[in-house]
């Protein structure tokens, strides 16, 4: 879980910097009647952008207003100091952890149209791909979980046309909680409380589309079904005390018709 832990600690650090926890992880999948479909994982930090831009503007203003800067070069025209890595890449490599998946799953049987999502302007990162059947989807996710998050996951989804199941594995929300707990040792309760406070509104949303079927029933207590019955949504908040008490999770058994 080393890579995953580093990823989530980077998220927390950015949350502290931006004074906001507007982080949304979105897992979206479409399952057609023949078992084929598409999968997309997105890390959406777009709501942080305004705050980060404001801080950058304040820093730029301070630089312009500084007099007698010892680093200035007189008589040599305009001088641009070397770019600060944090300014050059404010995400600290966070986007690479989410989006550099294409090389890992290209060539996997049953997987096609692999696309990296790396929108540094709007703080959106992730990946998407098409699959021929649920077995191909599970193969790809097994590779992604092993290579990128150092977790062993054999099977995440089951689908046979009449039923759908999302197993209680590969849960990024639960893994985030574990990563934060492992980072906090004895005597660091205050740090954990701060983490929970800043990440209380973080969401991990699963959206499942069934264009050829309608959802009859779901055993996940917080799942919601659209009026047309073709989409099921589970909106988790891993650091919400209310959801923690109710033991909310990603697992869902769904009956289709």
Predicted segments with their positions:
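Mature, soluble, non-transmembrane domains
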Residues: 95-257
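Residues in flexible loops and secondary-structure boundaries
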Residues: 9, 33, 37-39, 53, ...
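Start-of-domain marker
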Residues: 23-110
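C-terminal motif of bacterial Sec signal peptides marking the signal peptidase cleavage site
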Residues: 18-21
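Bacterial N-terminal signal peptides that target proteins for export
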Residues: 1-9
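Hydrophobic helical h-region of N-terminal Sec-dependent signal peptides
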Residues: 9-16
């Amino acid at each position: 879980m080393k890579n995953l832990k580093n990823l989530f600690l980077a998220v927390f650090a950015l949350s502290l910097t931006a004074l906001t926890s507007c982080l949304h992880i979105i897992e979206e999948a479409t399952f057609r009647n023949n078992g084929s479909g598409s999968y997309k994982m997105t890390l959406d930090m777009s709501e942080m952008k305004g705050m980060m831009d404001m801080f950058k503007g304040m820093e730029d203003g301070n630089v312009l207003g500084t007099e007698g800067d010892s680093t200035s070069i007189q008589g040599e025209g305009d001088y641009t100091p070397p770019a600060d890595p944090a300014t050059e890449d404010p995400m600290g490599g966070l986007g690479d952890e989410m989006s550099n998946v294409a090389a890992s799953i290209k060539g996997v049987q049953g997987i096609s149209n692999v696309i990296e999502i790396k929108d540094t302007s709007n703080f959106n990162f992730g990946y998407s791909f098409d699959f021929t059947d649920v077995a191909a989807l599970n193969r790809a996710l097994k590779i992604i979980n092993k290579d990128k998050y150092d977790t062993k996951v054999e099977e995440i989804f089951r689908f046979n046309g009449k039923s759908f199941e999302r197993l209680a594995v590969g849960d990024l929300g639960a893994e985030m909680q574990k990563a934060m707990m492992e980072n906090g040792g004895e005597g660091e309760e205050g740090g954990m409380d701060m983490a929970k406070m800043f990440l209380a509104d973080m969401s991990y949303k699963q959206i499942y589309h069934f264009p050829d079927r309608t959802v009859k029933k779901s055993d996940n207590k917080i799942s919601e079904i659209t009026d047309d019955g073709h989409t099921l949504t589970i909106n988790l908040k891993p650091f919400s005390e209310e959801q923690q008490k109710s033991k909310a999770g990603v697992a869902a058994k769904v009956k289709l018709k």
